[in-house]
Structures are given as structure tokens and as C-alpha cells.
Amino acid sequence: MVMVDALNLGRRLRVRSTAYVAGEPVPFSWPMRTFISRNPLYGLEHMPFEQAVRRGAELFHARMFLPRSDYQRWQREGKVRQDTLAEEIARRAQALPAVPGIDWPRWLQALMQSAHDRDVVVPGVRAPDVHAALHGQPPSAQAVDVAVLLPALEQRLHGLTLPEAVDALWGTRLADELDELVIKSYLDFFDEDQSSWRMPGRERGLFAAWSEIAQRNARMFLRRLHVRRTLGRVQDPESAVVHVMEEMGIDPDAWSAYFTRELTRLYGWTGFVRWRSSAKHYYWAQRYPAEVVDLLAVRLVVGLALLQESARHRRTPVRREQLDALLHERGAECLLRNALHSGEVLPDWAQRIDDTLSRGGSKRCEALLQRYWPLWQARQGQDQAAALRELAAAADATAALEVLSPEDIAGLIQGLQEFARQEGMVWTLAMEAQAIDQLLAQVQVPQDLAAGKRPFAQAWFCIDVRAEPIRRHLERVGDYQTFGIAGFFGVPVGFLGYGKGSESHFCPAVVTPKNLVLELPAELDPEEDDLLSTLGHVLHDLKSSVLSPYVTVEAVGMLFGLDLFGKTLAPLGYSRWRNRIDADKPVTRLLVDKLTREQADSIIRTLQRAMIVKALHAELHIERERVDDDMIRELRETALRHREGPTRLQRTFGVSDKQEAEFIDKLREVYRVDADYASYQLVRLGRIGYSLDEQVNYVHTALTMIGLTKTFSRFVLIVGHSGQTENNPYESALDCGACGGASGLVNARVLAQMANKTAVRERLRGMGIDIPDDTWFLPALHNTTTDAIELSDLVLLPPRHLVYLDRLRNGLRAASRLAAAERMPKLLPQARAIEPAQAWRLAHRLAVDWAQVRPEWGLSKNVYGIIGRRSLSERADLQGRPFLMSYDWRCDPKGRLLENLLAAPVVVGQWINLEYFFSTVDNARLGSGSKAYHNVAGRFGVMTGSLSDLRTGLPAQTVMREGQPYHEPMRMIALIEAPLDFAGRALQSVVKVKSLVLGGWIRAIVIDPTQGYKPFVFNNGQWEERPPLVAPAEEEHAA
């Protein structure tokens, strides 16, 4: 077989870059273990929001707003601001074509109150046919002009891939078959040890490995797909892409758009490959590389084979020019084919059209089209006339409709069609306006703590909306002051947990931590020499058995059987019992400080000595007890080239010169006892811990960020959070997004340990922050599924604090029960009249019930992002809807802290908000459908059934209840407490957030304390002034 000409480097790079750019509208998709919320339209954020949703609907074949009936339900519940609805309708009506006698606002109001969700405009309808139907007349008799009808069909087909175009005209399933075939190949390649079969050659990359297998693949052979014809002629994915595109006759100027269409068909897989190819730390990506161009090449090669196979059996086109020729030479046939397979054919005519197409012949098709098309147009006209009559009656404009000319009717249809694209946006704006009013009605002028008043405890929570209820209840049950901060607490942590074999990242997904924290048994004294040996084992072995070595396979099977019955019949009791028998992990502490050079050198020496002992046993069968420390030291010095000549190995064990030389070489090359590798190890050890300067900086930044620079309590709780669920592939979606979809406890422990250090506090005192000696930073974990708060690292608690521990726990437990009592009725409507203790028990049961598809609502109904002092909103019951970010503009003279909040938590909050927005409006396409049909794919993703696109959004159970939306899709409303010009400068400085606000992706409010706490709402490109906030009542303030 003839090999195509190899592409030169320049052309290969152009193909790769075109493929990369074509995939940019698709957002990254992280593995399910670290579910990260992201805006599904992230790749379109450079556009205004309203323009982006139109483009997103085209790209992802998805709905961007809910059906009208859902918004009408919320309107009846008082969640839609009526005057905003009227204002938006009036404003948009001005841009519609003027039609005599048509009062556009009245018609549009009637449309939005229609009892039907269906579109008011019938696709492809002609105004003269509507006019005739309105007046009970038959349509005008005129010959069907194929040349007039073809351009619309041609334009539609040119927006499709060639397999999709063939499907549209022949009713085949080429595009679906293509998806199914490549998904199976993707599963084989990307599998992370879930499958018992391993695709060979994966280390060479996706396309190379797949092309080797595909040429002898049974699925391809049985399907009679001759991929070998193409694969035998190409050398790499880039040449495969070029070959296929040229074989299909696609104009090079259209390649980028064609690639985008291909890549968005399975945008979950595309998003995963886009993320994976950029994740340099991801083990599987390094071991088995894959790029977007690989993904595209596989699709194109299989797609071409499907086209060729279809051409052999049905004489369908393989090249674009063949399709164009078919449209122009056999236009009537193409129109009939499209009518038959579009799902819009008149039922009585389907069989006749099918028979005629089977018999063929241009004249036969032309004759049938002349008979069928007028009937179809007449039916369209009648359907449109009926819809207009109903709408006119609702608008009290029947008389105005009846006198319209065909030209006027065309203008009416055009206007209604244009408004139909905007209706969802109008509903959304009116809901957001109501939400803004509700927020401004509840927040109040903030008040500082009375001078000298010291709360019993202060607690830092993640900004996550699920923290709002428990913060509110904690403040009301006792003398507690709470703060909100991003859940990684500003400290990116690389973490090597006790008994774990690989590093985990606890920080936002877009950040790579520079520092590594080790978890060690608490009984180890950091000053003891044994710690160095322990570190050597941790860095060398990286393993710890969960079950004792003598536990047999049968015992594990028995435990699984107990799981099956226990989790099903008595989930709560069984969970408690299982936790007791699994509690083999010792109490631990974290190694947060940097190692000294002497410690690092000692660890490396320990590792090298261990490797020499291992080598002696493996290579020369010499046991440890037969060698002494001096011999090991001598071998180490020789391997490092610090000494020359024979070693005691020869004299003691009779090893020859050659054997000794080979052994020394193996020590260097295989066991890495080598000076160069020692330098590398030294660099790696340099990642362990944080320097004193770094620790001071992290603690200082966190304190000033939340405005806590004085009046410290005895207890300062740093509360991370995570969810708890059983049998749920999406469990990481319930954890802390700021920690990369993991628990926030590690970060809380790290920051608390830093803040409790005397050296750190001394440096902070010199920076104007004086933390009292009796203040203790205590890490804790908020379980968002049960609302329990568990204190951590109590072994480090100073004895003088123990007397207050019961009071602290009692307050936390009371707040947790009250929060559960608030949350359970939202989760289970039958639990409305429930006591806090009952709600607490119910929440714990749901958390361990493996049949429970919705143990909590997650972040559903999130809508607000509040940046300001807690006292601004602490008297408000915001129902778990705001991201609460503590901030005091008076502690931020240059605005840098506000800029950081806007650049990180606000942007992440917007991602979360729009993940919920789009997962709600089209759960089938932009969400992930029902959990009931989910299956784990390759241990990295979730599919619906056994074969589907990777499901990247939120499951229906997270955003829907009984088939109706539970989440209310609105854009995030970000409220900032700061002077207007101060906040404006910060918004201008953070380019990304400026773009999001100006583009309408975020709704912004500024409450200006220098102008009597007057709110300013950013709307239509300008700041709109609102009445000042009310001050809290005197008795409230005194309390």
C-alpha cells in the first residue's frame, strides 16, 4: 500500500493547532475522583452571555433555558419580579419589526403566559399559507420550485459532518455508530486498571496504539469497515487527519468548523482529553499520552470507513462535492429524503415517499414532490394560523390579526421567532431582579463587635453555600463569630497521607502546589533521630497495608458479604460498627516545617543504605545480618565515587573484581545510589514543608483577607468540609471544590499548625497582628451531609483549653442539629415537622445508606456571592444560597485582597453557579442524567449505561425533584461591601472578572459604606442607585 507523503513539521503543527483551537469551546472535564465544577460554556466566556447561550445551543445541541411552564410556576410562587418582566418585554419589543395594529408588548406578555411550552412559530412556514388558513381559504396553487427550496436544506447539511448529512438524507445511523465505535476504543485506551484486558502499546499514544489494534479489530471486521486502507497510508494522527479531510473533499477553510462539530458530538470525552493532556502531574497522562488531535484522528478514520461502507451498499456520497452534486442534480429526491427522515413528514405520505425513493428516478421524485409539498405547506400554514389565533385571543387582538396582509404576517412571525430566542433570558432577568430585591431587603448596615468584647469562639468556614445555615445557627446558639474563606484557606498543599503511595493535591484545580506535607504518626517526636529513618521509609516504600497480611481472600469476601447485608438492612448501625473495626490508622501529625540541609542529607543517606541492603540481598544473596555498617558505608562511598579500589565485599564474601564492578554499576543504575540522583532527591526533599517566611505569609494573608486582625477568641476553629455518601461515583462533587474535589481537613490542619507556632506569631506581632498566648487554632471538619462538625488534632490542644472543650462541643452539636432540622424537610418533604434530634439521626442515616441517590442537595439553589463583613448578612436567613466571603475593605488599603477574592473565589463560584444553571436547564445534555443509569467508566469517568459520552455535569437527583427543577437557574449575584470607586477599581484590575461582569456572566452589586450603605446594581452597562440599607434595631444591636 502506498504511504502518503509525510507531513513536514510546519504542516503538522498547523493541523495540531487547528485541532486544539477547534476544541477550545469544550471546557475541561476532570476525572470523577476530583469532580470540579466548571461552566459548560467556559470556552465562550469571551462573548456576552446572551450571545454565548445561542452559540452554546448550536455547539452542544442543548437547551439553554427551561420550558416556559417552569418559570410560570416560579412566577406564581412570587420568585419573578413583574415590573422587570414588563420592562424587559417593552425594551426588546422596540427592536422587533413594526407590524400595523400589533401591540408587541401585549402579544409578548400573552406569549409568556401561554399554557403551552411548544414553540409558537412553526418551522419553515410561509406567510401566504398562514394568511390563507386564517381566512379559511386554500393555499395559492403554484408549482413547487426546487431551486427555491434547496438553499435552506443545503445550508443545514453544510453545518453537519458528512456522516450526519448522510443520516439526514438516508435515515442511517452513521454518526451514532461512529460514536459507539470510538467510545469503545477510548474506553480501551484510557482505562485505569478497571478492565481485565489491557490495550497493548498505549505508551506510544492514543492514535498509534489504536491504529495497531484497529487493523485487526473484530468489531471493525464484522462491521466491514476497512480502516486498514487509511491506516496503512498514514504515519501519525496529523497525517491521518489531512488524508481523511482530503478524501472527504472538505475545503481547508472549513476544517476548523468541521473539527469543532466532530469534537462537540462527544464533548465529555473531548473535555477529558483536553484536561488530561494539560495535566502534567497526572500519572495516567504521563504513562499513556493522548492529545485532541489523536481523538480527532480516530473519529475521522472511523467516520471515513463508515462513509465508504455506506457508499458500497447505498451509493451515498463520501466527498463533499458528491453531496453538492446530488443536491443540484437530484434536488427533488433530496427534499423528499429529508422530509421522510426529519420526523416531520405527513403521516399519510411516509409510505408513498419511501416507495418512490426505493424505486428511484428523478421524474418520479419530481412528480411526487409537486403533489406532496403543497399539502405539507398547507398543514404548516394551518398549524401556524391556529397558534396565532390562540395567541391573539390571549392578547385580546383577534381583530388585529384578521386584517394583517401576508407581508404583515411575515413580520409578525419574524418578530415572534426572534423573541422566542430571548424569552428564557427575559424570565431569567426577572428572577434575578427578584432575587436582588430579596437580598437587599435582608442585609443590614454591618456593626462591629463592641470594644473589648471577645467571643467564646471564632470559626472559619469555607465559602461554600452549605456552610451558611450552620454558621447562622452557630451564631445564634452561643457566643460565636464566624468567617468565610475559600476552603483551602489560601494554602496550596501537596499531601502524602499516612499509608498512601502517591501525592494528592489539596488546592484549586488550576493550581499546582509547590510544597509537600507528610502525615506521620503523632507519637514520633520531630527532634528524634528515628524521625529521619521514618521519613526514609515513607519516601521509599510509600505503602502501608490496610488489612493485616494474614487476612485471606475468603475473609475479604466475607467482609464484602457483610457490607451487602449491613448497608442494606441497618446502614447507620453497620456503618458505626464497620468504622470501629477499620479504625487502624494511628493518631497523626503533619510535617509542616522545612527540613534542614542536615536532615535532608541524613534522609538520603538512610535511603541509600536501605537500597544497598536490598541490592546485596537481591543481587548477591547476602542477608543484612552478614554485613556491618562500615561495609555498607564503604559501598555507598564507592557508588558515589567518593573512593576508589576494592571494598571489603571481595575480602569477606570472595566476590571477584568483575562481580564487584558489576554490582557497583547496578547500585548506580538500578538502585539509584548515585551522586546525580542524590541531587535530584535533595530537590524533591526540598518540597517538604514550608519555610517560616511562607508560613507567616499564609497566616497573615488569611487573617487580613477575612478581616480578623484583633480581638481573637480562645478558640479559632478552621473548619474544612466534605460530604459523605455511599455507592456514588460523584462523591467528590460533594467535597470541597477549592481543595480540588477533596476534603478540606488537610488544609485546615496545615494552617492551624502554622498559626499555633510561636515563631509565626512573633513575626505577625511585628506586622501589627497580636495573637494572644491563650488563642488556639483548632482544625475541624464539617460533614455537609450530616452537618456534624468533628474537631481534629485534639492531642495537640494545650491542657488549659481542655476545661472549655465540652462547652465548645455542645455548641457545635446544637448548631449541627438545628441545621439538620432546617435541611431535612427540603430533602424529604415528609420530614417537615421533625425535631432537631430526629433530623440529626435521619441525616446520619441518609449519609450511610447506599441506596440513597440524594443524601444532600449539594449546592443547589446557590445564587449569591457576598464579599463583606459577616455582620452585613448575619441577621438574614439566606436559606443556604450564598457563598459567604469575609472581607473588610478597611484592612485592604490598596485593594489587593479584594482583587484576590474576585480573581479566585468569585470566578470559582461563577463556575459552580453555571454548572448548576446548565445542568438544570438541560440535564440530559449538559447535566449527567439520572444516577440510576450511571456506570463507572475505566475508573476515571461516568457513563450512562454501558456506552455513552462521559457525563460531565450534575446528576438529575442533584438539581431536580420529581421531574421538576429544584435548583433555580440564575447567574451569580456578587455583592461587594466597599466604596463604589474602590470596588470599581478592583473590578477593572481583574481582567477576567471585568469581562464576566461586562459580559453579563455575573450580576454585580456594590454596597458603599461611604455613602450611607447605599447599594449600586450594575445593570445594562451602568450602576443603578438603590435606597440605603436599614440599620439593625437598637435592641438587636445591644443583644
From Swiss-Prot:
<dbReference type="GO" id="GO:0005886">
    <property type="term" value="C:plasma membrane"/>
</dbReference>
<keyword id="KW-0997">Cell inner membrane</keyword>
<keyword id="KW-0472">Membrane</keyword>
<dbReference type="InterPro" id="IPR018752">
    <property type="entry name" value="DabA"/>
</dbReference>
<feature type="binding site">
    <location>
        <position position="721"/>
    </location>
    <ligand>
        <name>Zn(2+)</name>
    </ligand>
</feature>
<feature type="binding site">
    <location>
        <position position="736"/>
    </location>
    <ligand>
        <name>Zn(2+)</name>
    </ligand>
</feature>
<keyword id="KW-0614">Plasmid</keyword>
<keyword id="KW-1003">Cell membrane</keyword>
<keyword id="KW-0862">Zinc</keyword>
<comment type="similarity">
    <text>Belongs to the inorganic carbon transporter (TC 9.A.2) DabA family.</text>
</comment>
<keyword id="KW-0813">Transport</keyword>
<protein>
    <recommendedName>
        <fullName>Probable inorganic carbon transporter subunit DabA 2</fullName>
    </recommendedName>
</protein>
<dbReference type="Pfam" id="PF10070">
    <property type="entry name" value="DabA"/>
</dbReference>
<comment type="function">
    <text>Part of an energy-coupled inorganic carbon pump.</text>
</comment>
<keyword id="KW-0479">Metal-binding</keyword>
<dbReference type="GO" id="GO:0008270">
    <property type="term" value="F:zinc ion binding"/>
</dbReference>
<comment type="subunit">
    <text>Forms a complex with DabB.</text>
</comment>
<feature type="binding site">
    <location>
        <position position="464"/>
    </location>
    <ligand>
        <name>Zn(2+)</name>
    </ligand>
</feature>
<feature type="binding site">
    <location>
        <position position="462"/>
    </location>
    <ligand>
        <name>Zn(2+)</name>
    </ligand>
</feature>
